[in-house]
Amino acid sequence: IPAKAQQTPDARKILDETASLFTSKGGVKATFKADNFTEGNLQGSATGTMCIQGNKFQMTTPDMITWYNGETQWSYMKANDEVNVSVPTPEEQQSMNPYTFVNLYKEGYHYQLKEKTLRGKSCYEITLTARNKQKSPHTIILDINKDNHNLMCIRMQQRKKGQWTRISIQQLHTGQSFAATDFEFNPKDYPQAEIIDLR
């Protein structure tokens, strides 16, 4: 099916349905695989889990745990027992939390809608292209399951051409309950960690 013109009403409706999974049904827990590419060459990969509630998240990979409570971010590096504390910019949030698209798509992007098959499932492929060429991410491609509107894959191109991130969602569970403390670093759990405050 050929791509439809820019602000496709169907694409917006599909995006609204997918976004509602993250905003109206409690928290979300996902397992994922993230790959970073430069000029088509794989630069690095990571697998992990992510817990999301509104604009808060906790992400765990083999090397790092990140907590974000909507304002402050803590990144714990397992290898050197170190915690970086920061207040991320919106652009930094987008690179850490793929679900920022929940608000991102609503303004500043054109849409294109196609249909495809991914992992044996029928999907919508929606390409978001920034109207402002200086905006980052410049291009976002979302693969959305046609049956339940779950997000299956996100590809993001940063403003610098040739740099892509692909996040494949392996499992997605909606309607999860999380405590506020799930999104904050607890120093009692890491008594030996060196805390580096970058705020």
PLM regions with names:
Residues 21, 48-51, 65-66, 111-117:
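Short, exposed beta-strand/loop patches in secreted or surface proteins that constitute
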Residues 2-42, 53-56, 189, 194-199:
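N-terminal leader/targeting segments and the immediate start of mature chains
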Residues 25-27, 45-47, 54, 68, ...:
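Extracytoplasmic
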